[in-house]
Amino acid sequence: MSIRFVDLEKRFGDNVVLDGFSLEVPDGDITTIIGPSGSGKSTCLKTVIGLIRPDAGEVWVDERRVDTLEGDPLYEVRRTVGFVFQFAALFDSMTIFDNVAMGLRRTGELDEAAIGERVRESLDLVDLEGVEDKMPSQLSGGMRKRAGVARAVALRPQYLLYDEPTTGLDPVTVTVIDRLILRMRDELGVTSLVITHDLESAYRVSDRLAMLHQGRIRWVGAPEAIRDVDDPAVQGFIRGEPELWEEAS
Ligand SMILES: Nc1ncnc2c1ncn2[C@@H]1O[C@H](COP(=O)(O)OP(=O)(O)O)[C@@H](O)[C@H]1O
Ligand SMILES: [Mg+2]
């Protein structure tokens, strides 16, 4: 049971974004893909739930190949994969309760009482009690982010995908979100795939780091190991030296 990317290729026009991208996300762990803005991180994350289709290669969730799925089978896979969007992506005209309840209502499996219970449980998990009736605009950026996590876990997914969970937040809120990512692993047992260019946050939450460079994974390993990796691309990224990064091939 895991998420696997096998030899993905993706281009937008002349822009080759993924070029032989392969990675396995082991069960129960937090795997983080790091790389600069524009390197293709969101693109690979979106292939997992069918928001972007690769030009070639395969994406697997457990035993299901998802890159070619459509309709109900794709929807079934999406239920097992919670997605925390970069800017929380809450619906502004809906209360926090309705935002978190949306996916649950769509399945039609729970009655309103059970949905209410699940929404409150999910908000408790992210330390957001008592905001059910508020609108997204009434919450701080960090609270909106947490509400986005609550919505992603409401269906009790097996996997959680986080797109830049800490980008644009103040340092204290970054720590809150980092702890939340760890808590989702520890309390819900979810397998997590995080993408970020925030290295400090990546060091804190990851069981495994994977560095994306020129459309493919350049290096995978334990966070403690990355500083000693003898590769100009890796060193260029972690030390913020664009010349090393760009010249590495
Ligand atoms: N839907 C799209 N249409 C055209 N170009 C896109 C689209 N999505 C992403 N791109 C381009 O693909 C590259 C990688 O984007 P993205 O995956 O969002 O990078 P990252 O998340 O690492 O910042 C960028 O050059 C971006 O402009
Ligand atoms: Mg992105």
Regions found by a protein language model. Give the residues of each.
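Conserved ABC ATPase "signature" region
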Residues: R64-R65, E112-G130
